[in-house]
């Protein structure tokens, strides 16, 4: 995944370590090719939010905007093992990552609004961009905006989401972003038993500035979305 970073060059990590496994925390910043260490340092946390320890990395070195780097968050465990989390980072204040993530989460939430009228739904305007195109979705296991509205709202299966959504930005630049959502749902089958489904959705979205002060929808709209 990739983590957009604003010009303040601060990256924040939230760590769930209720068992106290980690003894020390540190980070490394590398060139994307992995052949040049740009900086590293130790990390401490004095902040906790919702049970997560918060670590802020303030990148000291000058890094080029719109250039990808590899950031490694490391923790050394009590058993002598080192755990590493890798992410790409890129600096740009104009990617509108927060707005795009908000849009994707709203689109996803709308697929669980089983009572909404199709034409009044949040999804409907984005389906119209694909109106008249052949439906190339394979089944309920693979849907996109050429699918019917009924399919996009789960065709009467009425699942319940039982995990938090985990969003990941896979790609991002000033033109568009690819965002992945992962979560688990459950639904009752015809035998009255519970089935469980691991869901992965992909969205290709782009940001548009609002045309008027009252036009709030296009401010977080997308030209294309796929799930």
Show where each model-derived region lies.
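...the same signal can extend to comparable exposed beta-sheet modules
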Residues: 102-109, 117-122, 134-139, 171, ...
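Core segments of small alpha/beta cavity-forming domains
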Residues: 3-6, 10-16, 21-25, 68-160, ...
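Short beta-strand edge/turn micro-motifs at domain boundaries
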Residues: 32-37, 42-47, 62-68, 76-97, ...
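Surface-exposed, charged secondary-structure patches
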Residues: 1-12, 24-31, 36-42, 56-73, ...
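Aromatic sugar-binding surface patches on proteins
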Residues: 46-58
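Beta-strand elements of well-folded, non-transmembrane domains
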Residues: 17, 75-77, 183-187, 207-209
């Amino acid at each position: 995944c990739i983590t957009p970073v604003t010009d303040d060059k601060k990256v924040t990590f939230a760590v769930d370590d209720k068992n106290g496994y980690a003894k020390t925390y540190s980070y490394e910043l590398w060139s994307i090719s992995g052949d040049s260490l740009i900086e590293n340092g130790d990390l401490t946390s004095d902040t906790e939010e919702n049970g997560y320890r918060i670590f802020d990395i303030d990148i000291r070195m000058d890094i080029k905007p719109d250039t990808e780097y590899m950031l490694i968050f490391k923790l050394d465990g009590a058993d002598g093992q080192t755990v590493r989390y890798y992410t790409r980072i890129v600096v740009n204040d104009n990617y509108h990552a927060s707005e795009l993530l908000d849009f994707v989460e709203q689109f996803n939430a709308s697929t669980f609004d089983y009572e909404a009228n199709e034409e009044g739904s949040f999804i409907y305007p984005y389906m119209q961009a694909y109106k008249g195109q052949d439906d190339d979705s394979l089944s309920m296991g693979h849907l996109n905006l050429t699918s019917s509205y009924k399919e996009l709202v789960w065709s009467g299966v009425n699942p319940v989401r039982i995990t938090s959504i985990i969003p990941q930005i896979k790609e991002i630049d000033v033109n568009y972003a690819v965002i992945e959502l992962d979560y688990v749902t459950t639904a009752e089958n015809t035998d009255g038993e519970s089935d469980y489904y691991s869901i992965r959705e992909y969205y290709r979205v782009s940001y548009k500035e609002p045309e008027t002060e009252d036009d709030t929808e296009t401010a977080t709209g997308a030209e294309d979305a796929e799930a």
